[in-house]
Amino acid sequence: MSAPPPPATGFDPGRALQLAARTFEIEARALLGLAARQGAGFAQAVQAMLACGGRVVVMGMGKSGHVGRKIAATLASTGTPAFFVHPAEASHGDLGMLVPGDVVLAMVP
């Protein structure tokens, strides 16, 4: 006795690969565009984080918050004291966690 055939789904492996490749191309172009738009503000932010005598406090909301959480986690795991604070929580008391010497990295779309 053999297993029944899988149900027909209309799945096309070749089409799935085409769509994946197209998605990667779109994302790669977006990253290249972002790299081209970096200016003095980016360099100033990097300099502030490098010179920070305290911690890097990352804030963001929505998708920017998800990215901010990842940035804070990456900084912390690579030796830079950092943590994430949701801006709504910051406005309701969590700003008290900031101390002199901290640098705030506010993520905005």
Which stretches of residues belong to each language-model region?
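Conserved N-terminal alpha-helical segment that immediately precedes and caps sugar-phosphate-binding
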Residues: 1-109
